[in-house]
Structures are given as C-alpha cells and as structure tokens.
C-alpha cells in the first residue's frame, strides 16, 4: 500500500511524515493506495477492482509523437462527469488572463515592487491570486502570466482546475500542502511544484504563520520540460532524479463541495456532494511534481567572464522556434564566483526576452539593496537593466578571490512575448517610485585617455 489520505488536514504532522514520492522527470509511473486497485496488463477492464471507474486524462493529442505524448489512467471512486454539475459564473477579479490590456496610467519602464502585504480579510489560495503581468493569448495556447499570491485560509471544501494552462507554484513565505487528484505534495520555500493543465487540486496551509505568499507562472503553451544540456553533457543543472511525483492518495468525503474552473480566462463554479479528489490508483506520465531548487547543480565560468543566464534554466516551455522559449523558469542559486579579471555580477543587458523576477530569500548579487524577499521586478523586452550603482562599484573594485555567493535564491520567468502590466500591478502601493534612481550613480568615466579608470 502506498498511501491513503482521507480528509487530509493542514496541521497533520504525522500525515506529512508519511508522504511518499516517486523520483524522475516524465517517467511512466504507477501507484495505488489500496492493494490490487491498479489493473495489470490493461487499462480499461470490464469492471475494476473495488468498484472503481477507469478514466483517461490526456495532456496531449492522441497522435502527438511518443516523446511528447502524455496521458495517465486514473482509477477513481466516481468518474469526473460526476464532479461537475451545472456551472454558474464566478469572479476572481484580480486573476487576469492574456490577452489583457488593462487601462492604467503607468508608462513603460523598468519596474520593481516590495512584497505584497498580508491580507486583512480571510482569503484562500484562489482568492489570493493577483496577476502582475500577462503575455500572449491563452485561447491559442501561447504565452504565460506571472502572478503573486497571498492568502491565509485553507481550501477545505473548495477545489479547482485550470483548463488554460499548467501552474508552476513558487512558495516564498510559508509551506503549502498541495492535494491533487493524483497525490499530495508538501512544498516549502526553495521548492517548487507543478500542477498540470486540467488537474483538480486544492491548497492547504502548512505551518503556524499568519500568511502564505509566493509566485505563480501560468503557462499557456507547451508544457514545461527539462532544457537541453548541449555541450554540458549528461549531468548538472536540474537532474531528472530530483523531481518527485506523489504517490496515489484519495479523499473519501461525502459532503457539499465546490468545484471552481478557469476556462478561456473566465471562472465558473459548480456544487457537488463529495470530494473530487477520489483517485485510488493511477499510472501514466501526465502527473504533478515537486522539485527542490537546492538540488540544482549550477555550472559557470571557471576562468573568466560571466556566462549567459540560460545556464541557470531549470525548466523550459518550448515553442516551434528552436531555442526560443514560450517561457523559461530560471534560478540564481548559491554558487562559487571564481572568474579572474572579470566583472562578476550579471552584466548590463538589453534583451529580446521579457523578464519577471522574484526573490525567495537572501540577496540578489546585482541588486543588494531594494530587491527584497517577496518582492518582484519587471524588465520588458529591449528595456536596459543590470547592476545598480552600488553593486557596480563594489564588484568593479573587489579583490577577485574565490567567493561563495550563499544564502540566496532568486528566480525569473522569462518569455519571448512582451509582458503586459495589469491595472492591479500598476496601482499596487508597493510599487517603488524610486527604482530607476538605483542607476543614477553610474557616472561617466570616459575622458578620451587610455587606461583603467
């Protein structure tokens, strides 16, 4: 028996100790909560053991190439047709979907925000999502959105699935228990989790703090996968064995519940009389996973110069243009800086890609002041960015001995599409009006005469 969860609660430490995972990225897994619940040798028996129903969940067209073909077979207490009734319109006004061209008065520019403050009212995860940027078009399955979340209440009898895209969740403050229909994941800051498109889940709080905060990348396009390593070879970066998929778990609950759906940018809700998280066994390769960012094995320059930040890519969602991502998930983890005769922080840059950044903890080496844990920044396509004046002076004059950049974890959602700012983000009280001043100290040093200045 792998794992059975009935009415899993947020504060159940014993249950947390029992959570189990299966290692690997994109594997064809199999798992059962009750012995004999998983059929052997076929997918759809005439009658399933325990009176379960067989159901397929497809994450790709049937005819997708084998390398990108994704599906899982679920064996559940009720088929999913019993998990929805007649829908009513629902409203989550701060969760926006591309294309979204909100009207606001904030002009184009480099932007940075302090953390969103804890809510004064009671909010669950769905109610706590705030969209910062959108890019592309969800109805054509292109682009992404960058969200922040802040909440303080469990989704006890509320459940959700997103038909518009997969959700990459990045906790910053407070651990989460993510209960999906295919299993349970405990996810803490410096870990991430991914919930595939269309998969039912709810999120519970874990821990004793008063608010939970983090970031979400909603990927409308091709699903996240591991980037190619090229000349790096067979190892390093995010290794497949470090991705963890939950074993089967189910919630056997007969009471009024609400199922919320996001579909083409609109929200709907329906009421049912039981929990939809009723998968007792499953097998396949379309599944949620978690990943500990601290297991990322960085590579870098070991003699001189600063390499491109693409070497820090954890996951990439590709497009038809090779090497051009719908969205990349990139981190800036602890690492040694050893390059000689080199300006070691990230260099000044203008980019075809648009960059949304967040900081989970510590300091970011290009912005030691002003960019704080829980904060955000946005540098859209072709807008210049780079180290602030303080970081430049410090790095330009530092003794170039080996230095470990430690106790830090920043990340970036980077997309080929321009990221449109929402009205909420443009008017957010934590927007730093003085952000551009961080570069004011970068004065002219050129005087026409040769030599280091």
Swiss-Prot record:
Q: Name one GO biological process term.
A: L-phenylalanine catabolic process
Q: Per its UniProt entry, which superkingdom is the organism in? A: Bacteria
Gene Ontology, cellular component aspect:
cytoplasm
Pathway(s) it belongs to: Amino-acid degradation; L-phenylalanine degradation; acetoacetate and fumarate from L-phenylalanine: step 4/6
Annotated Fe cation binding lies at 349, 355, 385
Q: Which UniProt keywords apply?
A: Dioxygenase, Iron, Metal-binding, Oxidoreductase, Phenylalanine catabolism, Tyrosine catabolism
Q: Which cofactor does it need?
A: Fe cation
What catalytic activity does the UniProt entry give for this protein?
homogentisate + O2 = 4-maleylacetoacetate + H(+)
* Quaternary organization: Hexamer; dimer of trimers.
Spell out the protein name for this chain.
Homogentisate 1,2-dioxygenase
């Amino acid at each position: 028996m792998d794992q059975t969860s009935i009415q899993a609660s947020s504060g159940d430490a014993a249950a947390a100790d029992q959570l189990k995972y299966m290692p690997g990225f994109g594997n064809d897994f199999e798992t059962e909560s009750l012995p004999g619940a998983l059929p052997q040798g076929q997918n759809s028996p005439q009658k399933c053991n325990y009176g379960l129903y067989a159901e397929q969940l497809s994450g790709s067209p049937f005819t997708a190439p084998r390398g990108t073909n994704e599906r899982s077979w679920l064996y559940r207490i009720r088929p999913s047709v019993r998990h929805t009734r007649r829908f009513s319109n629902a409203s989550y006004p701060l969760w926006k979907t591309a294309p979204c061209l909100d009207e606001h008065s904030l002009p184009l520019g480099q932007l940075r925000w302090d953390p969103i403050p804890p809510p004064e009212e009671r909010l669950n995860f769905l109610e706590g999502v705030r969209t910062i940027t959108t890019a592309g078009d969800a109805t054509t399955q292109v682009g992404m959105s960058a969200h922040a979340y802040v909440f303080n209440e469990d989704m006890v009898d509320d459940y959700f699935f997103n038909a518009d895209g997969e959700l990459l969740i990045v906790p910053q403050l407070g651990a989460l228990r993510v209960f999906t229909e295919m299993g349970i994941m405990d996810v803490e800051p410096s870990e991430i989790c991914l919930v595939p498109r269309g998969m039912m889940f709810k999120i519970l709080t874990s821990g004793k703090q008063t608010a939970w905060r983090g970031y979400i990348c909603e990927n409308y396009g091709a699903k996240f996968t591991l980037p190619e390593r090229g000349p790096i070879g067979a190892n390093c970066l995010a290794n497949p064995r470090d991705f963890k998929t939950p074993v089967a778990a189910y919630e056997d609950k007969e009471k009024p519940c609400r199922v919320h759906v996001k579909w083409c940018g609109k929200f709907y809700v329906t009421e049912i009389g039981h929990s939809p998280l009723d998968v007792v066994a499953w097998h396949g390769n379309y599944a949620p996973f978690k990943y500990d960012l601290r297991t990322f094995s960085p590579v870098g320059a070991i003699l001189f110069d600063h390499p491109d930040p693409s070497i820090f890519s954890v996951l990439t969602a590709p497009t038809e243009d090779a090497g051009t991502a719908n969205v990349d998930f990139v981190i800036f983890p602890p690492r040694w800086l050893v390059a000689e005769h080199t300006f070691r922080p990230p260099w000044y840059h203008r980019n075809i890609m648009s960059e949304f950044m967040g900081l989970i903890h510590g300091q970011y080496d290009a912005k030691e002041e002003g960019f704080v844990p829980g904060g955000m920044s946005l540098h859209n396509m072709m807008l210049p960015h780079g180290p602030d004046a303080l970081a430049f002076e410090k790095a330009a004059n530092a003794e170039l001995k080996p230095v470990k950049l430690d106790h830090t974890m920043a990340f970036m959602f980077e997309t080929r599409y321009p990221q449109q700012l929402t009205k909420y983000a443009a008017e957010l009280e934590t927007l730093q009006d003085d952000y551009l001043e961080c570069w004011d100290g970068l004065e002219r040093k050129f005087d026409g005469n040769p030599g280091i200045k």
